Design a protein with these regions (language model features):
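Topology signature of small-to-medium multi-pass alpha-helical membrane proteins
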Residues: 1-145
Length: 145
């Protein structure tokens, strides 16, 4: 068998791929805005939010980085119709789950950030899992090579 997929994916496959790419670009943007936050911007945050950032363990930041960068790579792999997109999305989901474990059970993130942060955390987990399932579905349909 050659490196080409045997079945042409439907138009909605490409729409999902673009949505996945945009979603993950938002995640990368959020990560970069945190990673490169200036002291002046940090000083404008409420004290409780500053404390969240200052006390967050390095492994949580690493999980965040893994989640967003592998999510972006998985989205690009889908657009290139590569089977390894699924493995990259699994890595992204692992990063998501580690990060959300901390936010949900090991910190007071939701007390400080409110209900919106809780809803966003749930959506991130759902979207991460959906991308793993979608990549698996696309692979099973021979849309990926």
């Amino acid at each position: 068998m050659n490196d080409k997929s045997t079945v042409k994916p439907p138009m909605w496959f490409w729409i999902v791929c673009v949505i996945a790419l945009l979603w993950n670009l938002i995640g990368v943007s959020a990560y970069l805005s945190e990673a490169f936050m200036t002291e002046d911007v940090f000083a404008t945050l409420p004290e409780a939010q500053q404390s969240l950032y200052e006390t967050r363990p390095k492994w949580v930041t690493a999980a965040f980085a893994i989640a967003v960068w592998s999510g972006l790579m998985g989205s690009l792999a889908l657009l290139l119709k590569k089977k390894w997109a699924k493995a990259i999305f699994v890595l992204s989901l692992f990063g998501i789950l580690l990060q959300q474990l901390y936010h949900c059970f090991l910190s007071n993130t939701f007390e400080v950030m409110g209900t919106t942060a809780m809803i966003l955390s749930i959506l991130i987990i759902i979207f991460g899992a959906a991308l793993v399932l979608f990549a698996n579905f696309a692979s099973n349909r021979n849309w990926l090579s």
